[in-house]
Amino acid sequence: MHIIKTVLIRHGESQWNKDNRFTGWIDVDLSNQGYSEAKRAGQLLKKYKFIFDYGYTSVLKRTIHTLWVILDQLNQTWLPIQKVWQLNERHYGALQGLNKNEAIKTYGYDTIQKWRRSFKDIPPKNNKNDLFLGTNDIRYKNIETNTLPNGESLELTANRVIPYWQKYIEPKIYNNNCIIIVAHGNSIRAILKFLNQLDDSEIFNIEIPTGIPLIYEFDNNIKPIRYYYLSE
């Protein structure tokens, strides 16, 4: 049986990860630690001799810069890259910009955990004048305004991630291309839930670490055979 490998990576630690703030669609860069994580991920993929055909990121710089660093380590900076908003992090609505501990004080631990981890619960939405809306940006100028979120559940995130996966990424995998996708904790959780056919409760406790390659091995019909994190 022929095995096709796809690599999923959550971006390296961002500055707001470090500061313990809800980030969502806010375009913050990697921290120094995040750049180091991306470099290590690239070195690890080089050790296992990965050669990619296509790369995908969100339109947020923490994923773009992570992939740049990885490809530099692999000497594959020529790789065609698609940057798409559908792979963006979940939009955290009115939580964006808040320190997570302060949010817990305001809303309560159980409520915050439900908003963060459940499949269907949506955090409070923000309005078009909110400082941390994240969508009032030139990169989204060609997207219909009513398409852009102002607060999402994981389910709503999956509703944009999975159709893109099925339409654009799956055919590439089916044609035996090696793909690398650098995305976000929740966009990757959405893909993982879809590929592994997890029910809503099973996704609750799944956490995606920053900067560690997650390898999916598929058969010829794009059915997952196994998945694992790459290690030293």
UniProtKB/Swiss-Prot annotation:
Annotated gene: gpmA
Chain residues that bind substrate: 10-17, 23-24, 62, 89-92, 100, 116-117, 185-186
CDD domains: HP_PGM_like
Entry's EC annotation: 5.4.2.11
Active site residues according to the UniProt entry: H11, E89
Family as reported in the entry's similarity comment: Belongs to the phosphoglycerate mutase family. BPG-dependent PGAM subfamily.
Domain of life: Bacteria
Protein name, per record: 2,3-bisphosphoglycerate-dependent phosphoglycerate mutase
Enzyme class: isomerase
One term of GO molecular function: phosphoglycerate mutase activity
Pathway membership: Carbohydrate degradation; glycolysis; pyruvate from D-glyceraldehyde 3-phosphate: step 3/5
UniProtKB keywords: Gluconeogenesis, Glycolysis, Isomerase
Subunit structure: Homodimer.
InterPro entries in alphabetical order: His_Pase_superF_clade-1, His_PPase_superfam, PG/BPGM_mutase_AS, Phosphogly_mut1
Free-text function comment from the UniProt entry: Catalyzes the interconversion of 2-phosphoglycerate and 3-phosphoglycerate.
SUPFAM superfamilies: Phosphoglycerate mutase-like
HAMAP family from the UniProt entry: PGAM_GpmA
Catalytic activity: (2R)-2-phosphoglycerate = (2R)-3-phosphoglycerate
GO biological process: gluconeogenesis; glycolytic process
